[in-house]
């Protein structure tokens, strides 16, 4: 797989209706316990490895892998001995009246 550079990933995500794109860098052996976000995510792992648990299943992700999370989905994250970096395209929840 040809991994795009960040600017290309960002431009593609914004063209597909995402609101923002962020680079997330996690230190070695860190964890993010079960939580939710007020946005949906389409992400690309670019360095290291991580484990993402949602809907009762855990996925092992390495550089080049993608993952998606819908708005407010409970999930947990765990990062490998070298940490991990991923690019996350975020789509915020529509405003309510």
Model-derived regions: residue spans:
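Amphipathic, hydrophobic secondary-structure cores in small proteins
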Residues: 32, 37, 53-55, 63
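Short acidic-glycine-tyrosine-enriched beta hairpin
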Residues: 55-72
């Amino acid at each position: 797989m040809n991994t795009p550079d960040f600017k290309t990933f960002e431009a593609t995500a914004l063209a597909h209706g995402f609101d923002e794109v962020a680079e997330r860098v996690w230190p070695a052996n860190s964890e993010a316990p079960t939580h939710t976000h007020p946005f949906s995510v389409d992400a690309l792992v670019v360095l290291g490895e991580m484990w993402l648990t949602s809907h009762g299943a855990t996925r092992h992700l390495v550089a080049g892998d993608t993952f998606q999370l819908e708005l407010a989905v409970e999930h947990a994250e765990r990062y490998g001995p070298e940490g991990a970096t991923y690019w996350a395209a975020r789509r915020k929840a529509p405003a309510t009246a």
